Amino acid sequence: WNNQFGEDEANRDIKTSDLLSALDIGFESHHDQVVYAPGTLRTGQDSPYSVFTPFKRKWIENFDMNFLDIDYKYEKKNATNIKSNLDDFGFEKTHQADMSLWQEGEKEALKRVKIFLKDKAINYSKDRNDPIIDGTSRISPYLALGIISPKRCILEALKANNFEFTSGHIGITKWIDEIVWREFYRNIMFSFPKVSRGMPFQDYSKSIQWRFNESELAAWKSGHTGFPIIDAAMRQLLHEGWMHNRLRMVVAMFFTKNMLHDW
């Protein structure tokens, strides 16, 4: 399995590892959500990074192409039919988005990355912030589910940019930045477990007096707040199962700073 870095998830993986070891069952775990295992990159004072720019600088300084050795093929296993029922696990069936927009599989994910780097990356640095333009890679669902790794994305980006991180194609270097941002926040989650406990990263915000309104929350979730940009974003999520990166930030800020709902 791929390791996860939230406190509960990490503890679950430890317990699972201990149980499998006790039963003499072999297993493998990987840090495949990231290029560097969380906690690997440290400041000169041997403390975890809490600011992105120095983290990115260290990330690039320590980079080795051997990190991207990703061509190992696992032997195909015989399929095991394990019946499952959502009710057994306590899950509820929710609204089904249009999944035809998301062809499954690693080949599809890699195809999307290559098409993006070839056709869209040229304008990515400016188009990425305009949700009316189809200017992003739309690779986030594949990354989130482990269908493609950030290592593979970095490798393809470097190949398309003469193996340069900070020079060359401005759109590609910006896309690499976004992948490093993703890794930075996984390091935050690993290094500062309090954020997994519903506590803010910045202590000064502990004093915020949150409010809660059930009907406002329902309106936000369904895209009926009366604010067009918010409603369009939430309806996109409901319809496509995905939301534009800029809109993710907009609806989150609206939820916390305008509605004053606890994140």
Give the residues covered by each predicted segment:
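Trp/Phe/Arg-rich N-terminal binding region typifying the photolyase-homology
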Residues: 1-67, 235-236
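C-terminal substrate/ligand-recognition segments
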Residues: 186, 191, 215-261
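Helix-loop-helix junctions that connect adjacent transmembrane helices in secondary transporters/permeases
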Residues: 194-226
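An acidic- and aromatic-residue-enriched active-site/binding cleft used to recognize and process polar
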Residues: 3-5, 30-33, 57, 147-148, ...
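Glycine/tryptophan-enriched, flexible segments
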Residues: 48, 54-204
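Secondary-structure transition/capping motifs at alpha-helix termini
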Residues: 22-23, 160-165, 240-243, 261-262
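Short, surface-exposed helix-loop/turn micro-motifs enriched in polar/charged residues
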Residues: 8, 131, 167-168, 243-247, ...
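Flexible loop/turn segments at secondary-structure boundaries
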Residues: 7, 151, 195-197, 257-262
